[in-house]
C-alpha cells in the first residue's frame, strides 16, 4: 500500500510517499481502507520534532507515519472486535492516517452517518472533540454565558463557535480581519480583530475563555474573566517553546488558579466513541458543519503540511484518497 512516511524530523521535505506492507489488525483493532484524512497541528509538530515536549513524548523520528484523523470503510477486524464488521463506514483517530490503509483501535472509531461525506467526517475527530471537551467538560459551558474563543478561525475554533452556539452561549471570536465574515457565518455574535484590539484589555467580561492560540497567559486573562470564570487552554503547545518555559508557564497558571475563584484548565482531547458519535450526529443533522479550507491528494501531503505550518488555515486541511 502507499503511505506517507519520514525517517528524520524536519520540514515537509522529509516526507515521502512509499510502498509499505499493509498492516494486520490485532485483537481489538480494525483495518480500514482510508477514504479521507485530515491534517492537525500535532502532525506538523511531530514531523518537525518540536516543540520540545514532542521530542520528550514521541522521541526522534526513525520510520514514522503521520496522520491522526481518518474516515473510511472497514476491511478487516481483529478477533475481539464486536462493534464493527467489514463494509462499515467509520471515522476516528489512528496512527498513520496518511495512507491507503490504517489500523484503528475499535475504541477510537464511530459509525460514519450515511449522509456525511468521508472528507467531512475526516475533518472532525481531533478538532471537533477538542472543541466539544474544551467547552463542555472542562469549560462547563452553560446557556446564556459569554464565551470568548481565541484562535476562532482554525480547525478547532470553527467547531467551537458552532458548538458554543448550540449550547446557548453568546460568542466572541478572536481572529484576523480577513476571517471575520467566516466566523460570523458560523454564529459568532462579536468579532475581535487581534491586530487592532487585545481582548485582554477590553471592558467585556467572559464566563469562559477557550484559548486555542496559547498567546494569552492565565494571569492576563484573569482581568477579563468573571469572578468564577474559567480559562481553558488547548493551544499551549503552539510555537517552539523550551520545556522549561512551557512547564514554567503551566505551573504558574495552575498555582494561580488553585488560590483563585477563577480557574485555569489545560487539556488534550481524549478520543472516545461516545463523543465521536455525538459529533457525527450533529454533522448529520446539519447543526455542525466542518469548515474545509483546502483539499489535497496523498502525494500532496508535503504541500498540505507546508500550509499547516503557516498557521493560516481557515478550518481544516483534508487529504482525499478516493481518486
Identify the function of each model-found stretch:
Residues 122-193:
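Mid-domain Rossmann-like dinucleotide-binding core that forms the NAD(H)/NADP(H) cofactor-binding site
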Residues 201-208:
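A short acidic, Gly/Pro-enriched loop at the edge of an enzyme's catalytic core
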Residues 94-106:
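A structural motif shared across PLP-dependent enzymes of the aminotransferase-like
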Residues 216-288, 321-323:
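Glycine-rich phosphate-binding loop and adjacent beta-alpha segment
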Residues 47, 70-94, 170:
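A glycine-/small-residue-rich N-terminal strand-loop-strand element
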Residues 280-281, 285-294, 302-323:
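C-terminal capping/lid region of NAD(P)-dependent oxidoreductase domains
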Residues 85, 114-117, 140-146:
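Short helix-loop-beta connector
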Residues 11, 20-71:
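N-terminal glycine-rich beta->alpha transition that marks the start or flank
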Amino acid at each position: 500500500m502507499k503511505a506517507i512516511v519520514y525517517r528524520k524530523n524536519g520540514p515537509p521535505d522529509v516526507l515521502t510517499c512509499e510502498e509499505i506492507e499493509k498492516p494486520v489488525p490485532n485483537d481489538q483493532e480494525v483495518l480500514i481502507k482510508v477514504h479521507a484524512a485530515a491534517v492537525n497541528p500535532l502532525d506538523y509538530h511531530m514531523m518537525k520534532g518540536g516543540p520540545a515536549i514532542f521530542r520528550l513524548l514521541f522521541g526522534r523520528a526513525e520510520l514514522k507515519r503521520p496522520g491522526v484523523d481518518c474516515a473510511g470503510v472497514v476491511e478487516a477486524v481483529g478477533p475481539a472486535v464486536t462493534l464493527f464488521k467489514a463494509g462499515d463506514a467509520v471515522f476516528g483517530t489512528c496512527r498513520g492516517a496518511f495512507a491507503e490503509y490504517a489500523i484503528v483501535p475499535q475504541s477510537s472509531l464511530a459509525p460514519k452517518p450515511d449522509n456525511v461525506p468521508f472528507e467531512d467526517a475526516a475533518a472532525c475527530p481531533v478538532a471537533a472533540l477538542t472543541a466539544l471537551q474544551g467547552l463542555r467538560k472542562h469549560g462547563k459551558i452553560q446557556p446564556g454565558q459569554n464565551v470568548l474563543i481565541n484562535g476562532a478561525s482554525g480547525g478547532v475554533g470553527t467547531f467551537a463557535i458552532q458548538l458554543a452556539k448550540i449550547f446557548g452561549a453568546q460568542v466572541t471570536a478572536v481572529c484576523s480581519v480577513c476571517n471575520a465574515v467566516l466566523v460570523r457565518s458560523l454564529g459568532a455574535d462579536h468579532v475581535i480583530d487581534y491586530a487592532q484590539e487585545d481582548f485582554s484589555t477590553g471592558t467585556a467580561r467572559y464566563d469562559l475563555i477557550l484559548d486555542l492560540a496559547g498567546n494569552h497567559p492565565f494571569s492576563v486573562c484573569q482581568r477579563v474573566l468573571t469572578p468564577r470564570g474559567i480559562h481553558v487552554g488547548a493551544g499551549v503547545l503552539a510555537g517552539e517553546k523550551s520545556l522549561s518555559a512551557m512547564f514554567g508557564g503551566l505551573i504558574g497558571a495552575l498555582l494561580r488558579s488553585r488560590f483563585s475563584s477563577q480557574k485555569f484548565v489545560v487539556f488534550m482531547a481524549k478520543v472516545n466513541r461516545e463523543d465521536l458519535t455525538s459529533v457525527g450526529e450533529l454533522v448529520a443533522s446539519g447543526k455542525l458543519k466542518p469548515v474545509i479550507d483546502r483539499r489535497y491528494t496523498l502525494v500532496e501531503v508535503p504541500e498540505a503540511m507546508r500550509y499547516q505550518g503557516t498557521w493560516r488555515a481557515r478550518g481544516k486541511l483534508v487529504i482525499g484518497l478516493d481518486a
